[in-house]
Amino acid sequence: RKVWLNEIIEYIKVKIENNQEINLNFICTHNSRRSHLGQIWLQMAAAYYEVELVKAYSGGTEETAFNPRAVAALQRAGFAVREGIGGNPKYEISSDLHTLRIVSFSKKYDNLENPKKHFCAVMTCSEADEACPIIFGADLRVKLFYEDPKSADGTDYEVNTYDERCFQIATEMFHVMKKVFMKLQKIK
Protein backbone atom coordinates (compact mmCIF):
# COMPACT_ATOMS: atom_id res chain seq x y z
CA ARG A 1 0.00 0.00 0.00
CA LYS A 2 2.90 2.33 0.67
CA VAL A 3 3.71 2.44 -3.06
CA TRP A 4 0.25 3.86 -3.82
CA LEU A 5 0.33 6.22 -0.85
CA ASN A 6 3.77 7.43 -1.96
CA GLU A 7 2.35 8.22 -5.41
CA ILE A 8 -0.20 10.51 -3.75
CA ILE A 9 2.47 12.08 -1.52
CA GLU A 10 4.71 12.78 -4.51
CA TYR A 11 1.80 14.20 -6.53
CA ILE A 12 0.94 16.63 -3.73
CA LYS A 13 4.59 17.57 -3.17
CA VAL A 14 5.18 18.40 -6.85
CA LYS A 15 2.00 20.48 -7.01
CA ILE A 16 3.09 22.42 -3.92
CA GLU A 17 6.58 22.99 -5.33
CA ASN A 18 4.93 24.44 -8.45
CA ASN A 19 2.51 26.50 -6.33
CA GLN A 20 -0.48 24.78 -7.93
CA GLU A 21 -3.81 23.91 -6.39
CA ILE A 22 -3.93 20.25 -5.39
CA ASN A 23 -7.15 18.42 -6.28
CA LEU A 24 -7.75 14.79 -5.39
CA ASN A 25 -10.97 13.04 -6.38
CA PHE A 26 -11.74 9.84 -4.46
CA ILE A 27 -13.74 7.56 -6.75
CA CYS A 28 -15.80 4.48 -5.90
CA THR A 29 -18.73 2.80 -7.62
CA HIS A 30 -21.65 4.30 -5.67
CA ASN A 31 -19.96 7.25 -3.92
CA SER A 32 -21.63 6.09 -0.74
CA ARG A 33 -18.91 4.93 1.67
CA ARG A 34 -15.18 4.61 0.93
CA SER A 35 -14.84 7.56 -1.43
CA HIS A 36 -16.53 9.90 1.06
CA LEU A 37 -14.32 8.66 3.87
CA GLY A 38 -11.22 9.25 1.73
CA GLN A 39 -12.31 12.76 0.81
CA ILE A 40 -13.24 13.79 4.34
CA TRP A 41 -10.20 12.30 6.04
CA LEU A 42 -7.74 13.72 3.50
CA GLN A 43 -9.29 17.18 3.88
CA MET A 44 -9.15 16.81 7.67
CA ALA A 45 -5.49 15.74 7.57
CA ALA A 46 -4.65 18.64 5.24
CA ALA A 47 -6.33 21.04 7.69
CA TYR A 48 -4.48 19.49 10.62
CA TYR A 49 -1.09 19.89 8.91
CA GLU A 50 -2.11 23.29 7.48
CA VAL A 51 -1.48 22.29 3.87
CA GLU A 52 -4.00 24.75 2.51
CA LEU A 53 -3.72 24.12 -1.23
CA VAL A 54 -5.22 20.61 -0.89
CA LYS A 55 -8.83 20.16 -1.98
CA ALA A 56 -10.42 16.73 -1.72
CA TYR A 57 -13.49 15.60 -3.66
CA SER A 58 -15.42 12.38 -4.14
CA GLY A 59 -17.60 10.80 -6.77
CA GLY A 60 -18.81 7.51 -8.15
CA THR A 61 -19.47 5.80 -11.41
CA GLU A 62 -23.09 6.00 -10.22
CA GLU A 63 -24.98 8.40 -7.98
CA THR A 64 -26.79 6.81 -5.00
CA ALA A 65 -26.64 8.32 -1.49
CA PHE A 66 -24.03 8.83 1.23
CA ASN A 67 -24.64 5.71 3.31
CA PRO A 68 -25.92 6.54 6.82
CA ARG A 69 -23.68 3.82 8.32
CA ALA A 70 -20.59 5.59 6.95
CA VAL A 71 -21.97 8.90 8.22
CA ALA A 72 -22.44 7.33 11.67
CA ALA A 73 -18.83 6.07 11.62
CA LEU A 74 -17.67 9.65 11.02
CA GLN A 75 -19.82 10.83 13.92
CA ARG A 76 -18.29 8.17 16.18
CA ALA A 77 -14.87 9.43 15.05
CA GLY A 78 -15.75 12.91 16.32
CA PHE A 79 -17.20 14.77 13.35
CA ALA A 80 -20.36 16.82 13.72
CA VAL A 81 -22.94 16.03 11.04
CA ARG A 82 -25.98 17.95 9.84
CA GLU A 83 -28.20 15.94 7.51
CA GLY A 84 -30.26 17.27 4.66
CA ILE A 85 -33.44 15.71 3.34
CA GLY A 86 -34.38 13.60 0.34
CA GLY A 87 -33.25 10.39 -1.28
CA ASN A 88 -29.71 11.72 -1.75
CA PRO A 89 -29.35 14.17 1.14
CA LYS A 90 -26.50 16.64 1.46
CA TYR A 91 -24.64 16.23 4.74
CA GLU A 92 -22.60 18.99 6.30
CA ILE A 93 -19.60 17.34 7.91
CA SER A 94 -17.65 19.57 10.27
CA SER A 95 -14.91 19.61 12.84
CA ASP A 96 -13.72 22.24 15.27
CA LEU A 97 -10.24 21.81 13.82
CA HIS A 98 -9.62 24.83 11.63
CA THR A 99 -13.41 25.17 11.22
CA LEU A 100 -13.42 22.37 8.67
CA ARG A 101 -16.73 22.17 6.75
CA ILE A 102 -17.46 19.74 3.94
CA VAL A 103 -20.77 19.26 2.17
CA SER A 104 -21.06 15.61 1.14
CA PHE A 105 -23.60 13.87 -1.04
CA SER A 106 -23.46 11.11 -3.61
CA LYS A 107 -22.56 12.25 -7.11
CA LYS A 108 -20.82 10.99 -10.22
CA TYR A 109 -17.09 11.60 -10.33
CA ASP A 110 -17.52 14.09 -13.19
CA ASN A 111 -20.18 16.14 -11.35
CA LEU A 112 -19.95 19.93 -11.75
CA GLU A 113 -18.72 20.24 -8.15
CA ASN A 114 -15.67 18.07 -8.89
CA PRO A 115 -12.54 19.11 -10.80
CA LYS A 116 -12.54 18.54 -14.56
CA LYS A 117 -8.76 18.55 -15.07
CA HIS A 118 -5.47 18.62 -13.20
CA PHE A 119 -6.48 16.24 -10.42
CA CYS A 120 -5.40 12.93 -8.95
CA ALA A 121 -8.05 10.22 -9.32
CA VAL A 122 -7.85 7.98 -6.25
CA MET A 123 -9.71 4.78 -7.06
CA THR A 124 -11.01 3.39 -3.75
CA CYS A 125 -12.59 0.22 -5.17
CA SER A 126 -11.72 -2.25 -7.90
CA GLU A 127 -15.24 -2.12 -9.39
CA ALA A 128 -14.96 1.60 -10.18
CA ASP A 129 -11.41 1.07 -11.42
CA GLU A 130 -12.65 -1.55 -13.90
CA ALA A 131 -15.77 0.43 -14.89
CA CYS A 132 -13.72 3.54 -15.71
CA PRO A 133 -10.63 2.59 -17.67
CA ILE A 134 -10.11 6.29 -18.42
CA ILE A 135 -10.76 9.21 -16.09
CA PHE A 136 -10.65 12.24 -18.36
CA GLY A 137 -8.72 15.20 -17.01
CA ALA A 138 -6.80 13.25 -14.37
CA ASP A 139 -3.06 13.97 -14.10
CA LEU A 140 -2.60 10.76 -12.12
CA ARG A 141 -4.67 7.69 -11.30
CA VAL A 142 -3.88 5.79 -8.11
CA LYS A 143 -5.39 2.45 -7.08
CA LEU A 144 -5.98 2.62 -3.34
CA PHE A 145 -8.61 -0.07 -2.86
CA TYR A 146 -10.39 -0.52 0.46
CA GLU A 147 -12.54 -3.45 1.51
CA ASP A 148 -16.20 -2.42 1.35
CA PRO A 149 -17.76 -2.19 4.83
CA LYS A 150 -21.11 -2.86 3.12
CA SER A 151 -20.36 -6.57 3.52
CA ALA A 152 -21.16 -6.17 7.24
CA ASP A 153 -24.49 -4.38 6.80
CA GLY A 154 -27.16 -5.87 9.04
CA THR A 155 -24.72 -8.03 11.03
CA ASP A 156 -23.58 -7.95 14.64
CA TYR A 157 -20.19 -6.62 13.51
CA GLU A 158 -21.53 -3.82 11.31
CA VAL A 159 -20.44 -0.96 13.61
CA ASN A 160 -16.99 -2.49 14.15
CA THR A 161 -16.47 -2.99 10.41
CA TYR A 162 -17.43 0.59 9.55
CA ASP A 163 -15.26 1.96 12.37
CA GLU A 164 -12.30 -0.16 11.23
CA ARG A 165 -12.60 1.08 7.65
CA CYS A 166 -13.02 4.66 8.83
CA PHE A 167 -9.91 4.31 11.03
CA GLN A 168 -7.88 2.65 8.25
CA ILE A 169 -8.68 5.43 5.79
CA ALA A 170 -8.07 8.13 8.42
CA THR A 171 -4.70 6.60 9.30
CA GLU A 172 -3.60 6.45 5.67
CA MET A 173 -4.74 9.99 4.85
CA PHE A 174 -2.96 11.35 7.93
CA HIS A 175 0.14 9.39 6.88
CA VAL A 176 -0.01 11.05 3.45
CA MET A 177 -0.36 14.56 4.85
CA LYS A 178 2.27 14.01 7.57
CA LYS A 179 4.78 12.96 4.90
CA VAL A 180 3.85 15.99 2.78
CA PHE A 181 4.23 18.24 5.83
CA MET A 182 7.65 16.75 6.63
CA LYS A 183 8.82 17.27 3.04
CA LEU A 184 7.64 20.88 3.19
CA GLN A 185 9.59 21.44 6.41
CA LYS A 186 12.77 20.24 4.68
CA ILE A 187 12.19 22.69 1.82
CA LYS A 188 11.82 25.72 4.14
Task: For the regions a language model picked out, list residue spans one by one.
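Short polar/charged helix/loop
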Residues: 1-188
